[in-house]
């Protein structure tokens, strides 16, 4: 029998998906996105619907089944972590046109810092989880995550985004955008960051890559990170996001206002729905392992989303889950025992 909180949360998730994705599909949002991506001058990407294997990879990761993740799932996570960078570009552009002291200015600054910080915090924790959960050691013998690892990760994760968001160098909009785009190569350092964290947490063993894995993670991240820069810049100019800052933009390309709105809506919805699904499963894990009561876990996830962003909240929930499961001798110290 389902818990009442489960019914409420699941119902809200379904309503959000139907209420927002429905109009998007009805208005031809996917067709508009495919039309833009398919016109890429260098790669000629055929469209988003031609890659169904990424959906299967997403399901593996969202289900926290990292020990059984295949190469497609690793590739999808790299792509997902890199592509969240397009929202900060949009926020930065909108912030530059907002009136000083307005609520729009404050909301975009908060959103930009939250988004960049979310990305910076979640990347190395995903790397750590890849290493830990793909280990062949029994879960009871693995060393739990260190509190210092999370503190250091938060400090490193929010320092550079704060400098970019607050524009401490007083640079132009184009320089800020290039700073954000440069920040998106952070996934390339994902495995290197995991090795740095290893020093602070005392990890001694790293799993060896299986011979049947066809796509090395780091090689894919490097290629994907380089390609992402060109794709983001092309999509930005194609959709008129950088209107007024790209003199070479032709009159024909400027006639894409409807497409820009649809793509922006897609990015917003995709970001919210993806993290909502992942936080829903994180909430389930917290109450399934009886780490927190249902309503306390739900309230903490909601407050965390508002204050520090969904990615950092998900990372914290994942940290609690992993620390409880991996910590030896802590199995009986659950609430209610």
Curated annotation (Swiss-Prot):
The chain crosses the membrane at residues 5-25, 72-92, 111-131, 149-169, 177-197, 222-242, 267-287, 298-318. It is a multi-pass membrane protein. It is found in: Membrane. GO terms for cellular component: membrane. Keywords: Glycoprotein, Isomerase, Membrane, Transmembrane, Transmembrane helix. Pathway: Antifungal biosynthesis. Glycans are attached at residue 65. Signal peptide: none annotated. The keyword Iron does not apply. Belongs to the membrane-bound ascI terpene cyclase family. Cyclase; part of the gene cluster that mediates the biosynthesis of the tetrahydropyranyl antifungal agent lanomycin that acts as an inhibitor of CYP51 and blocks the ergosterol biosynthesis. This is Terpene cyclase. The lineage of its organism: Eukaryota, Fungi, Dikarya, Ascomycota, Pezizomycotina. The gene is ORF5.
